[in-house]
A protein has these predicted regions:
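Glycine-rich beta->alpha junctions and the first turn(s) of the following alpha-helix
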Residues: 111-201
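Short helix/loop capping segments that flank catalytic or ligand/cofactor-binding pockets
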Residues: 46, 71-73, 103-105, 131-134
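Buried hydrophobic positions in well-ordered alpha/beta secondary-structure cores of metabolic enzymes
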Residues: 63-65, 94, 124, 163, ...
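A generic structural signal for well-ordered coil/turn residues at beta-strand boundaries
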Residues: 32, 48-50, 75-77, 90, ...
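A short core secondary-structure module
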Residues: 66-104
Length: 223
């Protein structure tokens, strides 16, 4: 949807028309899990914000680089990384198959409260990315970041879904559906349940407002 709002030329639209059905089928029907690691640990102002490189080869790209805090590193089927081709300033968004040669997960990850994110280091050394794994046409990622500042808020959908799942499980627990006595009539539990509902409703309302107002090239007052 975001790419459609930016306005595509015929070549870019053709690219989207080709890759979108495969992405949709993979995620919705084959349960393909995508990660999207961006962090590289580079110092701001170093002159090159993206250190991962992509070399065009027959049928796709060879990608080399390192992404830190690569969440879902141990479970993702595809790692969507940003990379640049030498001599071309446009950013590529490339889906690196987890099983491709040259892909390695390094390091330990055992922080209290965040073990489930599995955010280790993703190391890429000449990892082959098929051309149909180029998620967006070259340069469109740049345009989204520059012209659609709401872009990074799309992560909110995942967090809102996690909140909803926690609410559902808590409700089942309070009703005694998991082998414990019902606690739904306990006043302390009722107050806590109400507070959880309010937190969720506020987050959902803000997200719906953003969806209703979001647009390409928003004015400063709109932001």
């Amino acid at each position: 949807w975001i790419a459609d709002q930016l306005g595509m030329d015929d070549e870019q639209q053709g690219h989207l028309d080709r890759v979108r059905p495969r992405l949709w089928d993979g995620m919705c029907h084959q349960h393909t899990i995508h990660s999207q690691p961006f962090s590289e640990g580079r110092t701001p102002g170093s002159g090159q914000p993206i250190g991962t490189t992509a070399v065009p080869v027959e049928g796709g790209y060879k990608v080399t680089g390192k992404k830190i805090f690569a969440s879902l590193s141990g479970i993702a089927d595809i790692h969507n990384v940003v990379a640049v081709v030498e001599g071309d300033p446009r950013v590529r968004l490339l889906g690196v198959p987890a099983e491709a040669d040259g892909v390695e997960i390094q390091g330990d990850w055992d922080p209290l409260g965040m073990r489930g994110t599995d955010s280790r280091d993703l190391i890429l050394v000449d990892a082959f990315v098929p051309e149909d794994h180029e998620v967006l046409p070259p340069g469109v990622f740049d345009a989204m970041v520059a012209r659609f500042p709401y872009f990074y808020m799309t992560l909110s959908f995942t967090y809102l879904g996690l909140m909803r799942a926690i609410l559902d499980l808590t409700g089942e627990y309070l009703r005694g559906e998991h082998g414990v006595a019902s606690r739904r009539d306990n006043h302390v539990k009722q107050a806590g349940w109400a507070e959880m509902q309010m937190i969720y409703d506020k987050a959902q309302s803000l997200m719906y407002r953003v969806l209703g107002e979001a647009s390409v090239d928003p004015t400063k007052p709109a932001l």
